[in-house]
Amino acid sequence: MRPLFADPKTDFVFKKIFGTEEHKSVLIAFLNHLLELGEEHRIVEVHLLPPEQRPKVQELKYSIVDVKCVDARGTIYVVEMQVLNVEGFEKRVVYNVAKAYTSQLDVGQTYPDLNDVIGVTICDFDLWPEGEGPQKEPAVPMLSRWRMQEQHGGARGLGQLQLVFLELRKYDASRPPQTMVEKWAYFFREAPSLKVVPEVLAERPFKEALEAARVALFTDEEWDAYIRAGMAIQDERGALSLARKEALREGRKEGRKEGIEEGKKEGRKEGIEEGKKEGRREGIEEGKKEGMRAAIRGIL
C-alpha cells in the first residue's frame, strides 16, 4: 500500500518540493525560517540556479541532494539534504560553499562583484553528537549557524561564507513542535508516516510542501523514480554498514595480533627482570655461604 506522502529526504521528492518554480514559495519560507531573518531582511524572491551536470532522474549518490538559488540582493544559497554520514562530509560542504563563492567571477569581474554564499544543510544524522567525559565539547543545537569570526574577541567581521546545519535526529519528538524550525524538522522526519495533514503543519508552506509530496499526484515515472531512489539509499546504507563491520573485524584482528606481540615483548621483559632478580638473590645466598665457609676455614 502506498503512503499518503513520500519521504521529503529522498532526492526526487526534495527537489520536487524545493527545486521547482511551481513550489518556489516553499523554498523562500524554508530559508527565511532557518536563517531566522527579521522582517527587514526577509527573502521575498529567489531565482533557481541550473543544476550542474545532473540528469533529470539521478540514480547515483542518492544520499546527496542539493538545490541552488540566489535572492534579490544577490546572496547565493546552496540548500543540501544529506541522508548518510560519510567520511569527509563536512569538508565537502565547505568545498561546495567555497566553490559557489569563487566561481562567481567571470573574465573582467573584480572581487567587489562577489556576493555572499550561505550553505544550508539538512542532516538525517547527528553530525555533532554530544560528547562524553569531563572534557566534552559544548553541545551543538539542532539548528546551528557557523561563520568566520575573530578568535579572541568574537567579532564577526567576515560573513561572506556562512554555514547552517539542521540535524534532524536532534529533534525532540516527545512533544509537539513549537517553533518554525521545529516544524520543519517534524515535516522532514514524520511526513512519510502521516495519515492526514496534522494541525501543526496546516500553515501554507508546510501544507504546500506536503501537497508536493502527495503520492497520489505522482506519475508512474515519478513513483518508479521514488522507489528506485529509496532502494539506492538502502543499498548505500548497507554498503556503509558492511564497510564499517569489515573495518571493525580487521581492527580486532590487528589488535589481537599487536596484543600478542606486545604480550611476547612484555613477557620477555618481565622474564629478564625476574631472571635478574633471581640471579641477585642466588648471588647473595651464594655469597653468604662462601663467607661462612671462609670464616670456618680461618678458625680451623
Where are the predicted features?
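Elongated, amphipathic alpha-helical interaction scaffolds
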Residues: M1-L300
